[in-house]
C-alpha cells in the first residue's frame, strides 16, 4: 500500500475528527473540518449507521493517519504492543509516540508529522549526535534529539517553533529552542496523549 499523498483535510472530514494534519490552518480555525464538519462528497451530510466492523476500521484509520504509518508498519507495531505486558491498546499508542518523526513533531521542530517525517528522511535530524533517517526509529528515554547545524536556519523549522508557542511542547520532552536540541525524558502515559481514538476497538478488530 502506497503512502497517501492526496488532500489530507479530506481525511479529517471523512473520519470526523482533527488529526493534526494541517498545522497553521488548524490553529487559525481555517481547516476544512472547521468549515465543513461533515464527510466530503455529494452525500457527505447524510447520517448513516456504521456497523461494528466499520467503527473498528475507522478507529484504526484514525491512528494510522494520525501517526502517518502504513498498514505493514501498523501491524508490526500492533504485534509488538500485543507482546508487551499490560493494555495492548495503550502499549500501541506509547510505541507510536516513540517514533522519531513523532518525537520531532512533539518537540516543536515541525508543524506537522508529515513535515517531521521529511526532516528525518532528508537527514536533518541527529539522535545522540548521529544522523538517523528512519522515521520509525524508536526513541528511548534520555535520547538527545537535535537539528543538524546546517539546517538550524531552515525557515519551516523556525516557523514551527513559533507555532509551538501556541500549541505548547509535550511535557515528556525537554527542549532548548535556541540550540534546537531536545531530550526525550520519558514515555508518556496514555491519558497524556490527546489522540481522539478508542484504541480498544482496534484491539477488538485484530483479535478476531
Swiss-Prot record:
Gene Ontology molecular function, alphabetical: rRNA binding; structural constituent of ribosome
Keyword RNA-binding (UniProt): yes
SMART domains: Ribosomal_S4, S4
InterPro entries (alphabetical): Ribosomal_uS4, Ribosomal_uS4_bac-type, Ribosomal_uS4_CS, Ribosomal_uS4_N, S4_RNA-bd, S4_RNA-bd_sf
Gene3D superfamilies named among the record's database cross-references: Ribosomal Protein S4 Delta 41, Chain A, domain 1, RNA-binding S4 domain
GO biological process: ribosomal small subunit biogenesis; translation
Keywords noted in UniProt: Ribonucleoprotein, Ribosomal protein, RNA-binding, rRNA-binding
Membrane-spanning segments: none
A GO CC term assigned to this protein in UniProt: small ribosomal subunit
Assembly information from the UniProt record: Part of the 30S ribosomal subunit. Contacts protein S5. The interaction surface between S4 and S5 is involved in control of translational fidelity.
UniProt record similarity statement: Belongs to the universal ribosomal protein uS4 family.
HAMAP family listed in its UniProt record: Ribosomal_uS4_B
Listed NCBIfam families: PRK05327.1, rpsD_bact
Protein purpose: One of the primary rRNA binding proteins, it binds directly to 16S rRNA where it nucleates assembly of the body of the 30S subunit. With S5 and S12 plays an important role in translational accuracy.
Protein's name according to its UniProt entry: Small ribosomal subunit protein uS4
Gene of this entry: rpsD
Amino acid at each position: 500500500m502506497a503512502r497517501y499523498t492526496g488532500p489530507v483535510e479530506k481525511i479529517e472530514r471523512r473520519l470526523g475528527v482533527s488529526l493534526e494534519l494541517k498545522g497553521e490552518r488548524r490553529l487559525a480555525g481555517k481547516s476544512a473540518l472547521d468549515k465543513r464538519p461533515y464527510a466530503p462528497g455529494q452525500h457527505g451530510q447524510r447520517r448513516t449507521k456504521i456497523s461494528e466492523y466499520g467503527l473498528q476500521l475507522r478507529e484504526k484509520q484514525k491512528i494510522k493517519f494520525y501517526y502517518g504509518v502504513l498498514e505493514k508498519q501498523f501491524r508490526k507495531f500492533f504485534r509488538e504492543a500485543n507482546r508487551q505486558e499490560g493494555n495492548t491498546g495503550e502499549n500501541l499508542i506509547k510505541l507510536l509516540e516513540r517514533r522519531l518523526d513523532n518525537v520531532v513533531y512533539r518537540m516543536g521542530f515541525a508543524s506537522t508529522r508529515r513535515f517531521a517525517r521529511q526532516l528525518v528522511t532528508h537527514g536533518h535530524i541527529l539522535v545522540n549526535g548521529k544522523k538517523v533517517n528512519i522515521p520509525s526509529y524508536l526513541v528511548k528515554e534520555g535520547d538527545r534529539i537535535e537539528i543538524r547545524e546546517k539546517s538550524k536556519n531552515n525557515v519551516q523549522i523556525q516557523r514551527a517553533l513559533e507555532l509551538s508557542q501556541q500549541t505548547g511542547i509535550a511535557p515528556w520532552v525537554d527542549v532548548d529552542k535556541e540550540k534546537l536540541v531536545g531530550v526525550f525524558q520519558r514515555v508518556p502515559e496514555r491519558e497524556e496523549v490527546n489522540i481522539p481514538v478508542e484504541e480498544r476497538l482496534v484491539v477488538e478488530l485484530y483479535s478476531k
